Amino acid sequence: EVVFCNNDAMALGALQSIEQAGRTVGTDIYLVGVDALKEAVQNVVDGKMTGTVLNDDVGQATAAANATKLYVDGSDVDEYYWVDYVKVTTENAAQYL
């Protein structure tokens, strides 16, 4: 079974319920959140969450600022600017603490 949460706050609540039910993340259920909150990332490091996704606010702000500068300077502006999400797992979680 897998629990996908729209944000880490939901994932942390789901983790409480999973533990209260006697289940073990990584053994009989998987748990993933979004936002890479420190508490969630620590739970990934500790093996209590399968992963989280970093919603790169710095990258988004940089893309928005760059697009704004292009617009103000009279340059062409793309309709969309994509900023990749970062998958945070046990392999890379420590660098996001």
Where are these regions (language model features)?
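Hinge/cleft segment of the Venus flytrap/periplasmic-binding protein
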Residues: 56-97
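Short beta-strand elements at the ligand-binding edges of bilobed clamshell
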Residues: 46-58
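Sec-exported extracytoplasmic/periplasmic mature domains
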Residues: 15-23, 45, 49, 66-73
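Hydrophobic alpha-helical
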Residues: 1-42
